[in-house]
């Protein structure tokens, strides 16, 4: 195991690698399938994630006895979504990098209801990231759509990437993967 590093410096590359194990062969078909965000108002969130960010609603699942709904979104062609419910469910759960939005019924009508985005104390969850071909063009469009920015592309020390907020205040990093090496 690597030597502990002072909190101010983080792990060295070597120390980080020494903390990692080679994946067990039994995990070769595992994939990161989804991340989940709790949402207050599905109408606002679905509009934001589809119209603003361009995701496609893959499937909606309702759980009446527990009073919540799940919405699964991803960057997929809506024409590829199977029509048969059983087939669609298996297909939706086999996609990579799916965003699951969880709506607990009634939260949209509760003015005191809000979710913690993890970027203020107590810190925890930080953000999701969306890769785009051109950060500046994407942000120009977001501005025209009235999207709330946490960081515009030329703000701060890390130029060329941005952070926007969804209707619940969750942060979304907007990045161009081909430019990240020059930013970090």
UniProtKB/Swiss-Prot annotation:
Its EC number is 4.4.1.5. GO terms for biological process: glutathione metabolic process; methylglyoxal metabolic process; negative regulation of apoptotic process; osteoclast differentiation; regulation of transcription by RNA polymerase II. Pathway: Secondary metabolite metabolism; methylglyoxal degradation; (R)-lactate from methylglyoxal: step 1/2. It holds the Pfam family Glyoxalase. Keywords: Acetylation, Disulfide bond, Glutathionylation, Lyase, Metal-binding, Phosphoprotein, Zinc. Substrate binds at residues 34, 38, 104, 123, 127, 157-158. It comes from the Eukaryota. Signal peptide: none annotated. It catalyses: (R)-S-lactoylglutathione = methylglyoxal + glutathione. GO terms for cellular component: cytosol; nucleoplasm; plasma membrane. Residues 31-177 form the VOC domain. The modification N-acetylalanine is found at residue 2. Glutathionylation at Cys-139 inhibits enzyme activity. Phosphorylated at Thr-107 in the presence of CaMK2. However, this is a consensus site for phosphorylation by CK2 so phosphorylation may be mediated by CK2 rather than CaMK2. Phosphorylation is induced by TNF and suppresses the TNF-induced transcriptional activity of NF-kappa-B. Gene3D superfamilies: 2,3-Dihydroxybiphenyl 1,2-Dioxygenase, domain 1 (3.10.180.10). GO terms for molecular function: lactoylglutathione lyase activity; zinc ion binding. The modification S-glutathionyl cysteine is found at residue 139. The active site is at residue 173. Disulfide bonds join 19-20. The modification N6-succinyllysine is found at residue 148. Catalyzes the conversion of hemimercaptal, formed from methylglyoxal and glutathione, to S-lactoylglutathione. Involved in the regulation of TNF-induced transcriptional activity of NF-kappa-B. Required for normal osteoclastogenesis. Homodimer. Belongs to the glyoxalase I family. This is Lactoylglutathione lyase. It comes from Rattus norvegicus (Rat).
